[in-house]
Amino acid sequence: MATSQADARDRQFLAVIGDEDSVTGLLLAGIGHVTAPPDSQKNFLVVDNKTDNAAIEAAFDRFTTERKDIGIVLINQHIADRIRHRVDTHTAAFPTVLEIPSKDHPYDPEKDSVLRRVRRLFGE
């Protein structure tokens, strides 16, 4: 699937799906964005133990398919595990999905879908 330069140029924002500490840190770093009314969509989702998987999947789908202004989706790896089937099936170049560690959950490269694809590509 070829991606046009115009499509890549329009993708100027980051999105984040993460725990409260990760999202807060990234918002303080300046990634926060809300689209113009009437929909006023945020580019982040704070996930806790009470957040159901359907809400996480809906945010992931919104950031990866509906929003054409998102270039990178950052997601805590332990949250990506909750919707692993969605993360693993996302193969588009834009937006790129990157799994990041959180304060309480260390990064495990064996679970990262991007690294697994790279290993498969190089025959490891």
UniProtKB/Swiss-Prot annotation:
Molecular function per GO: proton-transporting ATPase activity, rotational mechanism
This molecule's function is given as: Subunit of the V1 complex of vacuolar(H+)-ATPase (V-ATPase), a multisubunit enzyme composed of a peripheral complex (V1) that hydrolyzes ATP and a membrane integral complex (V0) that translocates protons. V-ATPase is responsible for acidifying and maintaining the pH of intracellular compartments.
Membrane found in the keyword field: yes
- Gene field: vma-7
Q: Which UniProt keywords apply?
A: Hydrogen ion transport, Ion transport, Membrane, Transport, Vacuole
The record's InterPro entries line, in alphabetical order, gives:
ATPase_V1-cplx_f_g_su, ATPase_V1-cplx_fsu_euk, ATPase_V1_fsu_sf
Q: What is its main location?
A: membrane
Signal peptide stretch: none
NCBIfam families, per the entry: V_ATP_synt_F
What is the membrane topology noted in the UniProt record heading this document?
A: Peripheral membrane protein
Indicate where this protein resides in the cell: Vacuole membrane
What does the similarity note say? Belongs to the V-ATPase F subunit family.
Any idea what this protein is called?
V-type proton ATPase subunit F
Describe the protein's quaternary organization and the partners it interacts with.
V-ATPase is a heteromultimeric enzyme composed of a peripheral catalytic V1 complex (components A to H) attached to an integral membrane V0 proton pore complex (components: a, c, c', c'', d, e, f and VOA1).
An example Gene Ontology cellular component term from the record? vacuolar proton-transporting V-type ATPase, V1 domain
Q: Which Pfam families match?
A: ATP-synt_F
**Per its UniProt entry, which superkingdom is the organism in?**
Eukaryota
